[in-house]
Regions:
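N-terminal small-residue-enriched
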Residues: 5-7, 11-503
């Protein structure tokens, strides 16, 4: 499998500084873990009964750099390692973790997690069933193992390119971060899965100023890729110029209108609205507890027949993709909404067992310190049949939203407020003036029923998304084609109240 980009055209050699990133039996080779040890830890976890137990080993190496005022202001490299032990008894979960991978400390964590149960000891399934190998991100040299000088070069190039774009660009901040996460997941049901998960991301933020007015633009990209990714088509200059373009554009933008009107969402990153206002409501834990607006609606119409929404953790190189989830289950493509009909939820092992549904491979966690829960991977709406130009031409008066900043959503009812960081007026079927201060206010399930046109131009985001839930952050992908929402409330600059919705 070849990556969808070319290597650096000058033949740059990004040499390794650490050879320890081989994913094959990482914890066996580097920490002396054996299958006998794993069986012993699981037996300790089930020593007081319990329906299920698992172990999550993690070794994370990471790098981060930040350039501000044309100089490197921060640089960090780090390593963390640990093991989390979970015991499930009915609907109760016991969890304990340790950053010491010695046998004594893992056994102590296992016995601590076991305190949730109070029944005769159970015996784990004899022997492990190892997951079939899959390689969605087969990098030869993970970014975290490349020379730091090459990473410094990237952020300095971004700073230079943004400042050269226009003299009105007065402030630039460029950042780079990468990591390599080695995991081992074993469970009392025989699960055995290993993975080595690379991740890299670059961001550029620019501030333009003139006549007492200022505006910000941001851009970036990445994925489960090697450092060479940033020396190809998706390079620092591309991100820097895009961030600068956005900032300059906003300097002359006019105030956003207010009221209910047609809204056209551009392809790609605007899919964050779908992710937040709809996607979280389709996670199984919320539906099991009946706190989601979508609870009990399987088989019912929840969207326009033009809407098909999927979550797909199997896309090569994508930020939200995983060979296996954090419970050792292979990820998959899950159809959530098909032609407007709700088909299913995103589940982990616990939700699947308690709800009597299939495990979709969406059990994710931030680190060994956290319990897994149902989470999205790459969530997007499939392309439709409409041409983007026809969608714009169909709007007499409305807003074209291209990029989004922050937002808030209440999972229980789907209400959301999102700020558009780049948007334009649509007047008489044409995109006209840029606008600033636009917020989109609505209800996720309701908005989907108002989608009347879906473009044939599906696009995924550039690989910068991070999703937060219950204090845990995980990398994700989002995407949509151009789509038209017939009626949506647009709040202009004068509107300050965001309705108090939860993030």
């Amino acid at each position: 499998m070849e990556p969808p980009w070319s290597l650096h055209p000058t033949g740059r050699h990004l040499t390794a500084v650490d050879k320890s990133s081989d994913k094959s039996h990482f914890f066996f080779e580097h920490y002396g873990v054996t299958e006998v040890d794993l069986e012993r830890y699981l037996a300790a976890a089930l020593s007081a009964g319990g329906d299920y137990a698992d172990l999550y080993f993690e070794y994370l190496s990471s790098t981060s750099l930040m350039v501000d005022e044309s100089m490197v202001k921060s640089a960090a490299q780090g390593i963390s390692a640990g093991c989390g032990v979970r015991v499930v008894s009915g609907e109760r979960t016991g969890y304990a973790y340790t950053d010491d991978l010695s046998s004594d400390r893992i056994l102590h964590a296992a016995r601590t997690a076991a305190l949730i149960a109070s029944a005769p000891a159970k015996t784990p399934v004899a022997g492990f069933q190892k997951s079939a190998a899959r390689s969605l991100y087969p990098v030869t040299l993970p970014s975290v193992d490349a020379e730091i000088s090459a990473k410094v070069e990237l952020v300095m190039r971004a700073d230079k390119a943004a400042r050269a774009y226009d003299p009105r660009i007065k402030e630039v901040r460029a950042s780079y971060a990468d990591e390599l996460r080695n995991i081992l997941v074993v469970a009392s049901d025989g699960t055995f899965a290993e993975d080595s998960q690379p991740l890299a991301r670059m961001n550029v933020s620019s501030i333009a100023k003139t006549d007492g007015n200022s505006a910000r633009g941001t851009a970036g990209g990445g994925g489960r890729v090697a450092l060479d990714f940033f020396f190809g088509e998706k390079n620092p200059e591309l991100f820097a110029k895009e961030a600068a373009r956005q900032a300059i554009l906003q300097l002359d933008a006019r105030e956003a209108p207010a009221g209910e009107m047609a809204v056209v969402l551009g392809p790609g990153w605007p899919g964050v609205l779908l992710h937040e206002a709809v996607g979280h409501g389709l996670e199984a834990d919320f539906n099991r507890k009946k706190t989601s607006a979508f609870a009990g609606l399987i088989g019912k119409r929840v969207a326009s027949e033009k809407c098909t929404v999927v979550d797909n953790g199997t896309m090569p190189w994508r930020r939200g993709s995983l060979n296996v989830d954090d419970e050792g289950e292979p990820t998959q493509e899950t159809v959530l909404i098909e032609k407007g009909i709700l088909k299913g939820y995103l589940s982990d092992k616990l939700s699947a067992r308690l709800m009597g549904i299939a495990d979709t491979g969406n059990g994710r966690r931030e680190s060994y310190e956290h319990i897994p829960m149902p989470r999205m991977t790459n969530t997007y709406m499939l392309a439709g049949q409409d041409h983007p130009e026809d969608i714009i031409r169909s709007v007499k008066h409305g807003v074209y939203a291209v990029n989004f900043g922050g937002g808030q959503v209440d999972i229980t009812n789907g209400k959301f407020v999102f700020s558009a960081s780049e948007a334009y007026m649509i007047e008489d079927g044409r995109i006209t003036a840029p606008i600033k201060g636009a917020t989109l206010i609505g209800n996720g399930p309701d908005v989907l029923t108002r989608v009347s046109m879906v473009g044939n131009d599906l696009k995924l985001d550039e690989g910068v998304g991070t999703c937060g839930k219950d204090g845990q952050a995980v990398p994700v992908g989002v995407g949509i084609p151009t789509l038209k929402v017939d009626r949506l409330t647009v709040g202009g600059t004068a509107r300050k109240d965001t309705g108090g919705f939860m993030q």
